[in-house]
């Protein structure tokens, strides 16, 4: 019986140092990085996504970064197919595939499969966008709670993208997403997955990191200039998944005159903290993960130890 190749996932909330840790690991072990980030797939979106720098991208091969125009969407199933294909190609080159990112739905889709869920429907999404514009997402969340209470319970009333997707699935299939996920067959991965989670021992330090990073994005108008350029294209709008990314929505609304620069900063930091909280909630549901303190001075060393243990076990 052939031994499955090892694939390492380095997960964590935003600002937990995933990119730096992965690059440090790749300095010690021949590896390639597969991005697990629903924002990094987009071109023309570098500042607000905290995209790795040109120097970092040159340090080690990266995949699934800058593969889409902001007008396009990228589903969990597309990610799953791409990640499995890339992991096989990287393993065949004799390197270790590192799945690195914070889009927990991608990690879940990769591990568990989402075969039972339908593909996105652009026309239906436009209808849901129009309804949300009329009544607001808290009301859309209440609508979802009546149709799929299990899914609604784990979503915040302002989690527009996931609320829209859950309502879309109900409209397309006549069944709640929670029921479809429960029915979905478990699909075995063609590799052994080592799940590593970078989690903070002190959330206040993570919150400080988040604020510092958002301030750096705003410095000199960098993020606002990026969003101005996106707006100037004329074909993008806040209903698109790309423009719903944290930082972009708030900057767009600021440029619309919805609030002051100080409020943009406050809202951007608050939204990023909410994202980190959701990411940590997802991580806690993954019982098989190996937890490493992202605030530890040698987090990458701890990751390398886990990899060595897994390789020796194979």
From Swiss-Prot:
Residues at which ATP binds: 12-19
GO molecular function, one term: tRNA dimethylallyltransferase activity
Cited Pfam families: IPPT
Swiss-Prot/TrEMBL keywords: ATP-binding, Magnesium, Nucleotide-binding, Transferase, tRNA processing
InterPro entries named among the record's database cross-references: Dimethylallyltransferase, IPT, P-loop_NTPase
Cofactor or coenzyme needed: Mg(2+)
Residues binding substrate: 14-19
Paired cysteines (S-S): none
Site description Interaction with substrate tRNA, residues in chain: 103, 125
Catalytic activity: adenosine(37) in tRNA + dimethylallyl diphosphate = N(6)-dimethylallyladenosine(37) in tRNA + diphosphate
Keyword tRNA processing: yes
Gene3D superfamilies: 1.10.20.140, P-loop containing nucleotide triphosphate hydrolases
Keyword tRNA processing: yes
GO-annotated biological processes: tRNA modification
Function (record text): Catalyzes the transfer of a dimethylallyl group onto the adenine at position 37 in tRNAs that read codons beginning with uridine, leading to the formation of N6-(dimethylallyl)adenosine (i(6)A).
Family as reported in the entry's similarity comment: Belongs to the IPP transferase family.
Assembly notes: Monomer.
Name of the protein described by the UniProt record: tRNA dimethylallyltransferase
Originating species: Janthinobacterium sp. (strain Marseille) (Minibacterium massiliensis)
Name of the gene this protein is made from: miaA
